[in-house]
């Protein structure tokens, strides 16, 4: 079968473009500062990109933690670490973690995929997220840390029980969030972004968007914005769409849905 004709281009840089919903999220994060904001939604829908754009537009500094079940307390709030003394002797000293640094210095604290974080660590953060705005850290020699007025915690989360290695968010944590928003649509303006990546090739952009719409009619095959952009970048590097889909996306769905993915792609990208 022949493929849609496309002139391969070197990978193009593109700026983040957001939908109206995405722009609203960026605006609302600023309005909610310094209170906790939690954005819940499937992987690749643009949650973290929207947070990063909020940070960039407002010229803020941020600390980042990519949450996972094996994360230790010292990865978040800090811990004792070995260091070398003035006479080259081994010492043990306290080192603030990213959360503590952000709390002291008034930075944004991005907790990415917080539903993968061990709940005992979440409990330690509670008092820093309510009206008391205090971080208890007795191990450091500073039993109570007064939090900077500009400290702002933003968390992203993948829904539990939907194929992600996640846990339910603590109800006490939810109650501390000024914004607790479920994202059910891509926050990225996908068409504009694909036009950037593919150098304005309208036929290929249309094919990608129609194929993505078909996939999203079934939750088990729904494609994320991230994967859609990866596929477009692969096409821009010279892969055919079918090659890109076979290498990037086909094996991300269950075996019984692989045929659906490939048949749908063939209908849009081959003639």
What are these regions (language model features)?
Residues 1-271:
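C-terminal regulatory/interaction module of P-loop NTP-utilizing enzymes
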